[in-house]
Regions:
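Eukaryote-biased RCC1-like beta-propeller repeat architecture
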Residues: 1-419
């Protein structure tokens, strides 16, 4: 994704392939609480960014993985437990010499998927969230015994993997049923979700929160399971679900992607509309109040100037969205939102007030560039085909991907083609 929210910070990749970060605890150099977007040094061209609780990872266009932030328990995968103030490259040898195509960061662990559809994991593992068969932390990336993986998502203490055939495997902390195995037990190995009717669906993308999990299938249906205490499962009640359960409350629209925050959910439809459910404290739902929502409510499109959205991200208490034109909007907890004050020029001290509705981040704070524009594809398959600069229309980068992954992306693209200048 060109956009990712951590616990209290935000990352975005601009259409110029530059990474910007702001908020608290993102590991910039020097370690500061950046109150408005600031460029992050690192590789020249970045394609994807993933934010965790206090660390983050980025994938460069050459397939290299860089990590930064808190290092305790090894989430950076650099062989020690030390923090890094700058983005630091993980040696390619850590992945068997194969390029990385996507990464996901959890509470204190990281998962990387390579062009060979292999999974590697590092970091905290007290709940088995690394999927390596034990509960020992890993300071370096360790290969997971699960092949053919094309998408992944990290929750706080659990992980979700999607295979090329659309099946889903989960591991880690199982309390509240967030693993989807009809129990509350943990798993130390990625375990197939085999309950019907979910097993018959072909999952395209997944999202994982603190204690709940979401999956979007190829038919545009949303499945939810885990903790439902605030309505974050989009099922109209506060009950937990131990098995994937179909959510059908989005105005009849097909779902394109979903994001999990701390006890809340954001859902993006194929029409570019945004729906929100769950905990509403600090305005994280973008619905002009702080009330919880048990039934998903549509975020007023006027806040986005009626522009269709192409990406959403959810953090602990803040949210972000990108329009098809590359405009960035944020809302929720003020420390992580990246707005300037009302001082002349709009570039003064940051405004730390919470926002109850989506508010546009001035493009000048992102170097005048928009957020990298991706096609409206499932979240983990939103590859940078639409980013024309820096050779991001395919070429050698696509050639390095598994044939099945490319096929699935092209199938998704065939539903809609978006062109931008």
């Amino acid at each position: 994704m060109a956009l990712s929210c951590g616990r209290s910070f935000t990352l975005c990749v601009t259409e110029d392939a530059e990474l910007f970060a702001w908020g608290c605890g993102m590991g910039s150099d020097p370690v500061l609480h950046e109150q408005q977007p600031a460029p992050v040094g690192g590789p020249a061209s970045i394609s994807r960014a993933a934010a965790g609780a206090r660390h983050h990872a980025v994938v460069a266009e050459d397939g290299a993985l860089y990590t930064c932030g808190e290092g305790r328990s090894g989430p950076l995968g650099l062989g020690d437990g030390e923090p890094r103030r700058r983005l630091t490259r993980v040696p390619q040898a850590a992945f068997g010499g194969v390029r990385v195509v996507l990464a996901s960061c959890g509470g204190c662990h990281t998962i990387a998927v390579t062009g060979a559809a292999q999974v590697w994991a590092c970091g905290e593992n007290d709940s088995g969230q690394l999927g390596v068969g034990d509960t020992t932390h890993r300071l370096s990336f360790t290969q997971v015994a699960a092949g053919g993986i094309v998408a992944a998502a990290c929750g706080w203490n659990h992980s979700v993997l999607v295979s090329a055939d659309g099946s889903v495997r989960t591991c880690g902390w199982g309390v509240f049923g967030c693993l989807g195995h009809n129990d509350r037990q943990g798993r130390v190995l990625p375990t197939l979700l085999c309950a019907e009717p979910f097993r018959a669906s072909r999952v395209a993308s997944v999202a994982a929160g603190d204690c709940h999990t979401l999956a979007v299938d190829d038919d545009g249906a949303l499945w939810a399971w885990g903790n439902g205490a605030h309505g974050q499962l989009c099922l109209g009640d506060q009950q937990n679900r131990l098995l994937p359960t179909l959510a059908e409350a989005f105005g009849g629209s097909r779902v394109r992607a979903a994001a999990c925050g701390d006890a809340y959910t954001l859902v993006l439809t194929e029409a570019g509309e945004l729906w929100a459910a769950g905990r509403g404290a600090r305005g994280r739902l973008g619905l002009a109040d702080e009330d919880d929502r048990l039934v998903p409510a549509r975020v007023d499109p006027r806040h986005f100037a009626h522009a269709p959205l192409c990406a959403v991200a959810a953090g602990e208490c803040h949210s972000a969205a990108v329009t098809a034109g590359g405009e960035l909007y944020t809302w929720g907890r003020g420390e992580a939102l990246g707005w300037p004050s009302q001082a002349p020029g709009g570039l003064g001290h940051a405004d730390l007030a919470d926002r109850l509705v989506p508010t546009r981040v001035p493009p000048q704070l992102l170097g005048g560039a928009g957020v990298g524009r991706t096609l409206v594809l499932p979240a983990e398959l939103a590859l940078a085909f639409a980013m024309g600069t820096h050779a991001r229309l395919g070429g050698e980068w696509i050639a390095a991907l598994p044939a099945e992954l490319v096929r699935r992306v092209l199938e998704a693209c065939a539903r809609r083609v978006v062109c931008a200048s």
